Amino acid sequence: MHPATADESMVPSPRHGDGQGGDRPVTPGADVVAAADWGPLAGSRLGVMTNPTGILAGSLINIVDAMVTSGKVDVAAVFGPEHGFRGTAQAGYSEAGHTDERTGVKVYDAYGADPDRLQTMFAQAGIGTVVFDIQDVGARFYTYVWTMYAAMIAAVRSGLNFVVLDRPNPIGGAGRGPMIIDSFTSGVGMDKIVQAHGMTAGELARYFDGELMPAAAGDMLGDRLSVIKVKNWSPKMIFADTGLAWVPPSPNMPTPDTALLYPGTCLFEGTNLSEGRGTTRPFELIGAPYVDGRWAEWLNRREIEGVLFREAFFTPTFSKNADQICGGVQVHIPDPYAVDPILVATEMLVGLKALYAEFGWRSGDSYPGRGFDLLTGSARFREQLEAGAAAEEIVGAWQQELADFERRRRAYLLYSRH
């Protein structure tokens, strides 16, 4: 397959940096377009798929507000993802369709909408171009990229243009983790990518178009897909290097450190431990009423690169183990450039299995461990863990499929990995 074409007038060259920041400011795609007086988006009725992260870096103004105020483009509709356009909803929820009070623009609820439903919304709105501008966090189970995926299928079938206003991947450009297999696709993984894809939304859109759209949609967007690149960004950077304001992409993603750990520690959603929801440090605080100080001691003896574990006690106010005192750990990140979040979580899970007979899977799934399997993309990880495999064995099992993915994605990358 050939990668989807990006208009070179829209894609300034990235900085080939050392991962430590630089003198030239990192400029997201939205700001690139705004600096061009919105010209690349003029002449078409726009449907903007965004949320509170879709801001202009210089003013922190939401792009829909800025577009409407400018009068230079025709914003016909907004399509809100999980948590909603203005970000008022918790995990697993969205904002119902409504008219935005500030701009007067019709807002559609796109969360969980399949391509057929999105096609209907696009037709009702009378749009010619879908514009996607949402800060992703680089993990397969973060739902925004799957809303984009479904919207791309709908755009292919409807003959619409699709523009991604690109933003940095806050955890960098390395691919990590296992590939999903067909029988484990779901709303937290609809198609074939690895657990931490190491791509920006724009790169992922190109990958989706070239690798997945022919089967999923019957055709490609091709030259109807454009990516407006981030200026001066390198995949060697972490988010702190960008100088950009961190706007929480979702209520439980409060800091860039949360994002660094999330591709691994989100796996605890599938267990009987709290993943820190209902605390101020979700995905950093992990624990359960049965956990004691042995877990932190065990983990620190492992000398896992980039992280340290502090024994912690907390009481979640909602979600699993709500209103119960939980023992556990807080994951600290002394070296963010060295962190492999999926290895970190694997070591944590192996330690739990070795130390606590009470360790188990989330209740309420169709079979014990189903939720965990959907997050990892197959039953293999869970079965290895249950069989007592070491972390090295579990991680080693997916290295070939990861290498295959990284080879396939190469043609779609927009920012040098060298």
Locate the predicted segments by residue.
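N-terminal phosphate-binding or glycine-rich loops at protein starts, especially the Walker A/P-loop
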Residues: 25-73
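Conserved functional hotspot residues or short segments at active or partner-binding sites
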Residues: 287-396
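Glycine-rich oxoanion-binding loops at beta->alpha junctions
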Residues: 91-127, 139
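Short internal beta-strands
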Residues: 74-83, 165
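Conserved anion/nucleotide-ligand pocket segment
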Residues: 184-262
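Glycine-rich, charge-decorated loop segments at or immediately adjacent to ligand/cofactor-binding or catalytic sites
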Residues: 86-91, 163-185
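Glycine-rich, aromatic-lined ligand/substrate-binding cores of catalytic
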Residues: 232-316
